[in-house]
């Protein structure tokens, strides 16, 4: 069953002005539930615009987006429901930390979902385990942690909401190779244990090849290819022509 589906999705920035630009054009894709898919494309191809439609941060100019069979539309009263289903981790998410303690920061999402305190605490502990942070970190201030640890706390805050779809936009940006491998390994472990759908946006073809099972290639606002890692990376000439 498709957990993500778009039909003729088009998004035009600054429509009706001299600065009008089509970021997505007649974008049609279906992604199966439980998939671990990498998303690649050169700068300006439409990657970020696409993922922001999946939890209603952006509304389509034309077309529809479906999550778990339901239409998503930014501005709808119940768009918050989709943001519980679709967890989005932006680049440098550590800049969004605000809790006095690590535990408070990670607990923010599930607490606002109305979950009982014992369930919130359980989710906080599980999420920190997934990102490789020990329980003795829970009462520390997130602002005293290293850059890599802050990144993991921010990711844990999204995992604690247990989204059906987890989207990570360049989650290892700015990290050293060791930190990058650690975080991506933890995300893979999370996927294998929870069986949730994971979309990983990355400029690193190496990371996509190592961790994803399928690859969505976006070019000029459209899905140019969507297939297994092996099949995509065998099309070297086409990828090179797209600047990848």
Region locations from a protein language model:
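Helix-to-loop junction immediately C-terminal to a conserved catalytic motif
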Residues: 55
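ABC ATPase NBD Q-loop/coupling interface
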Residues: 64-81
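Conserved ABC ATPase "signature" region
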Residues: 118-136
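H-loop/switch region of ABC-family ATPase nucleotide-binding domains
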Residues: 202-203
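Conserved ABC ATPase signature
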Residues: 141-145, 149
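A short, surface-exposed alpha-helical micro-motif characterized by mixed small hydrophobic
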Residues: 208-210
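Conserved beta-strand-loop-alpha-helix hinge in the C-terminal portion
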Residues: 222-243
């Amino acid at each position: 069953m498709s957990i993500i589906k778009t039909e003729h999705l088009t998004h035009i920035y600054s429509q009706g002005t001299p600065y009008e630009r089509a970021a997505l054009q007649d974008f049609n894709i279906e992604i199966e539930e439980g998939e671990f898919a990498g998303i690649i494309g050169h700068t300006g191809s439409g990657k970020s615009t696409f993922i922001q439609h999946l939890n209603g941060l952006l509304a389509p100019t034309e077309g529809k987006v479906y999550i778990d069979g339901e239409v998503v539309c930014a501005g709808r009263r119940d768009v918050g429901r989709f943001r519980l289903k679709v967890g989005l981790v932006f680049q440098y998410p550590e800049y969004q930390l605000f809790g006095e303690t690590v535990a408070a920061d990670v607990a923010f999402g599930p607490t606002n979902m109305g979950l009982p305190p014992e369930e919130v605490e359980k989710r906080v502990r599980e999420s920190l385990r997934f990102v490789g942070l020990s329980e003795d970190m829970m009462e520390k201030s997130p602002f005293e942690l290293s850059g890599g640890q802050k990144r993991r706390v921010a990711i844990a805050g999204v995992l604690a909401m247990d989204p059906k779809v987890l989207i990570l936009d360049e989650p290892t940006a700015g990290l050293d190779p060791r930190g990058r491998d650690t975080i991506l390994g933890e995300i893979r472990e999370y996927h294998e244990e929870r069986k949730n759908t994971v979309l990983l946006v990355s400029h690193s073809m190496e990371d996509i090849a190592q961790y994803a099972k399928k690859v969505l290639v976006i070019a000029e606002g459209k899905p140019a290819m969507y297939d297994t890692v092996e099949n995509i990376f065998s099309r070297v000439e086409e990828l090179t022509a797209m600047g990848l």
